[in-house]
């Protein structure tokens, strides 16, 4: 079976991650003690591929294939005392006592480096338990110290050890207006530098965009992190539903990557989810494939603060869940591309992939998850990069990092590495089909002369 190993790090990662496990347990009929509680009728579907995310332990308990890490015990304690706290294998909670203090260098070089071997041992143990490991999914934020510093350290170590497995990350970027710490731009830039090199697919999330969705679409006046994490977990569950349930058009992490990544460094995706409705208005909304399609391509639905209308889609993927006709899904997708052709690059024809999974999320008739590779994601990088430069020019707060043994050179390097994807996205946003052809002709001429 194609297993996925889930790793969550830092406060943000652990909070998103534990919410995700609540959703997954719910979808597979697993109760907080790890026992299966579904009916006989559901059991075929729920249990057929439950081992993608769960290990079956003695006595028929299902244990998540999850590794939880943090540099301070606080978040772990609250997960343990939470509703699904007893479901995780106790050995898989690896934590330090010191904390990273929002300092990337502590997470990556000093505190995190001391704890990393313990985490890797657990990861190896879990990986050996797998039949045919498909890949890893990592939940972390890029603004803090542990999720960003230690998270990227773990990603690079896992990359070294399992070079041929997919590495999918759910990365929460610092948002433009909501800032928790002053040094977010530093931490994020140093992390992006790592993600460009070592991750295969990055789902970019952002608190501000999530707040906007809660506020505007869900009509929540005071959204809590719980509400935001609920949105994220719905999306996470949607991205992997094809692996966990039978469907007419299934995809896995690798198929997703092959269809979404035209060039290796351009692997930062925007995600969206539909239907998003406020709690009171569900009964007034009919769920049809056109409705879902319209909502999921809507710029307001994107979970990161970049506007897809400011760029063009290189590729996109739509995952539908529920009983629906594949033909209708395909027609809708073609329809979207024809109507909005200016928002798609013309040098990748048919660049929207769709997949259909027969089992909808709990409580919905149908739903869809959107993953898009849009050049407008460079807005995110640009914004962080500007904030980084403003502080780095004055060498503000730098002593916290150099004190942990970092070098100023690393900052300069990270800054230019952050600007690489920006330039690359811009280049392909401006490229037209004709540029490419001229280029090919020139290349062909060169070859004739060389031979």
Curated annotation (Swiss-Prot):
UniProt cross-references to Gene3D superfamilies, sorted A to Z: Helix hairpin bin (1.10.287.600), Tubulin/FtsZ, C-terminal domain (3.30.1330.20), Tubulin/FtsZ, GTPase domain (3.40.50.1440)
Molecular function via GO: GTP binding; GTPase activity; metal ion binding; structural constituent of cytoskeleton
Subcellular localization, as worded in the UniProt entry: Cytoplasm, Cytoskeleton
Ranges where the record places region Disordered: 413-451
Cofactor(s) listed in the protein's UniProt record: Mg(2+)
Keyword entries, A-Z: Cytoplasm, Cytoskeleton, GTP-binding, Magnesium, Metal-binding, Microtubule, Nucleotide-binding
GO BP field: microtubule cytoskeleton organization; mitotic cell cycle
Highest rank taxon of the organism: Eukaryota
InterPro entries: Beta-tubulin_BS, Beta_tubulin, Tub_FtsZ_C, Tubulin, Tubulin/FtsZ-like_C, Tubulin/FtsZ_2-layer-sand-dom, Tubulin/FtsZ_GTPase_sf, Tubulin_C
Binding site for Mg(2+): 72
Assembly mode: Dimer of alpha and beta chains. A typical microtubule is a hollow water-filled tube with an outer diameter of 25 nm and an inner diameter of 15 nM. Alpha-beta heterodimers associate head-to-tail to form protofilaments running lengthwise along the microtubule wall with the beta-tubulin subunit facing the microtubule plus end conferring a structural polarity. Microtubules usually have 13 protofilaments but different protofilament numbers can be found in some organisms and specialized cells.
Record family assignment: Belongs to the tubulin family.
Functional description taken from the UniProt entry: Tubulin is the major constituent of microtubules, a cylinder consisting of laterally associated linear protofilaments composed of alpha- and beta-tubulin heterodimers. Microtubules grow by the addition of GTP-tubulin dimers to the microtubule end, where a stabilizing cap forms. Below the cap, tubulin dimers are in GDP-bound state, owing to GTPase activity of alpha-tubulin.
Protein name (database record): Tubulin beta-1 chain
Organism of derivation: Solanum tuberosum
